[in-house]
Swiss-Prot record:
Subcellular location: Cytoplasm
Descriptive protein name: Ornithine carbamoyltransferase
Pfam families: OTCace, OTCace_N
Enzyme Commission (EC) number: 2.1.3.3
Swiss-Prot/TrEMBL catalytic activity: carbamoyl phosphate + L-ornithine = L-citrulline + phosphate + H(+)
Source organism phylogeny: Bacteria, Pseudomonadati, Campylobacterota, Epsilonproteobacteria, Campylobacterales
Length: 329
């Protein structure tokens, strides 16, 4: 059973194939109409952590693919009342075709997947946010910033690629970890700038750097945001205090004071660089109002691409796991 728990579950060709499915589904949705590839299929959506974008994009996505989504908060299932993960996983997976889980500890997700009889998708865990990275890479492709990519929907692009430089500014959290994964797999240059004490996990960095030997990528961990942004094609940030870190909010504001992506910082990047943020954004903290609402910002295109990226992930998983699908003309 092939799950989608981290990007490292897939190789370069598989990631690009998944992105291609997402691109094709987006094209169909905008120009032809949605096709019911997953007609009659049921997606269980388990939210131990609440979300706006994750719920709306997955629920809309499975509907557009012809299936049905079932929303389950921690109040709706016995996991919130002490039932073992393995019991919940075996029961739910016996009644649905696919499961998306948004949780805290990544180990909970891994245990759930190990007992599930259907594919499990990581909607977010404390360590990784892989669905967001598929949406981010999809956005990069649409903006012409990516490695060699020969999708027929973009025939004038991908002729050798741009060998992009991505600068991630801020907390070494699940978003940083997933960017590290993607750089190791696809082979681009990633620079992460975080305050001392807030860098990404060392084991995740080491594994990705080992992968870069084959992929040709570069991963640099820095403490200077301007150095990271210098000549970058993509500038990314995230909230300084993630869900569950509210008590650290004031402490983190002080630590990250020099890591706000504002107009001055963006001036160090390429003139045609784009700005990405997975949202929600806190204006005046990790990003200025001017950057978030400016011409370089692709944040709302990126957010909308969550829908198409996750449709691509679901359909790709259904195909490789040989889930019986309805023939669509």
């Amino acid at each position: 059973m092939k799950h989608f728990l981290t990007l490292n579950d897939f190789n370069r060709d598989e990631i690009l194939a998944m992105v291609d499915v997402a691109l094709e589904l987006k094209y169909e949705s905008l120009h032809i109409g949605n096709k019911p590839y997953l007609k009659g299929k049921v997606l269980a959506m388990i939210f131990e952590k609440s979300s706006t974008r994750t719920r709306v994009s997955f629920e809309s996505g499975i509907f557009q693919l012809g299936g049905q989504g079932i929303f389950l908060s921690h109040k709706d299932i016995q996991l919130g009342r002490g039932e073992p993960i393995k019991d919940t996983a075996r029961v739910i997976s016996s009644m649905v075709d696919m499961i998306m889980m948004r949780t805290s500890e990544h180990s909970r997700l891994e245990e759930f997947a190990s007992y599930s009889s259907v594919p499990v998708i990581n909607g977010l865990s404390d360590d990784f946010h892989p669905v967001q990275l598929i949406a981010d890479y999809l956005t990069m492709i649409e903006c012409g910033i990516y490695l060699t990519h020969h999708n027929p929907l973009y025939p004038t692009k991908g002729k050798g690629g741009r060998n992009p430089i991505v600068a991630y500014i801020g907390d070494g959290n699940n978003m940083a970890h997933s960017w590290i994964n993607l750089a190791g797999i696809l082979g681009f240059e990633l620079r992460i700038a975080s305050p001392i004490g807030y860098a990404p996990k060392a084991d995740i960095i080491t594994k990705a750097q080992d992968m870069c030997i084959q992929s040709g990528g570069k991963i640099k961990i820095l403490n200077d945001a301007k150095e990271a942004v210098s000549n970058a094609n993509v500038v990314v940030t995230d909230t300084w205090a993630s869900m569950g870190q509210e008590e650290q909010k004031e402490q983190r504001k002080c630590a990250f004071a020099n890591f706000c992506v504002d107009e001055a910082m963006m001036s160090y990047a390429q003139k045609d660089a784009i700005f990405l943020h997975c949202l929600p954004a806190y204006r005046g903290q990790e990003v200025s109002e001017g950057v978030l609402e400016g011409a370089q910002s692709k944040v709302f295109q990126e957010a909308q691409n969550r829908l198409h990226a996750q449709k691509g992930i679901m359909l790709y998983l259904a195909r490789i796991n040989k889930i019986p699908l309805v023939s669509v003309e």
